[in-house]
Amino acid sequence: MNIIRKLKPGTISLVLGPMFAGKTTFLIHCIYMLERLEKKVVFIKSTKNTRDKTIKTHSGIQLQSKQCEIIESTQLSDVGSLTDIHAVVIDEAHFFDDLIKCRAWADEEKIIILAGLNASFEQKMFQPIVHIFPYCSWIKYIGRTCMKCNRHNACFNVRKNADKTLILAGGSELYVTCCNNCLKKQMY
């Protein structure tokens, strides 16, 4: 199915999944499609994500766009005017406590596309994601295979160290995504 048919002005689309599932890759694909339709796109990333200043996936895929503006912010309410923008794309949406701000942008007839984790390392949903759910006209779940057994669908994000900080940006050096069987066996 062509995703572009789902991305309508005034709607919020949400892409969820565990780490390393391809959510950012999906967003990059959406940005390219929107740009082909001559839509002005802004990509918002959290300053809490300290891994890279560009739009780049864990697997190294990087957005190659001269038109897409990248905004780094701690809160969405700090983002300036988006008057001339057609689409707002937000990666790591769970990092934004004021994710509900997207509703106001949707009311301004902007296309909103969010990507975030399905759950924390404690296997609990992030509250900003929970609060935006009722306003999403389309929700997509992207899964991946367990990084330990390579047999089952993985939906659990597990931190490799004992740090209990809720938000701790990192990649495979800090996290593993595993299935329920490996989580129960603590095979990470």
Curated annotation (Swiss-Prot):
Residues the record lists as binding ATP: 17-24
Entry keyword annotation includes Kinase: yes
Catalytic activity: thymidine + ATP = dTMP + ADP + H(+)
Key word ATP-binding present: yes
EC number(s) from the headed UniProt entry: 2.7.1.21
Gene Ontology BP term (one): DNA biosynthetic process
Protein name as annotated: Thymidine kinase
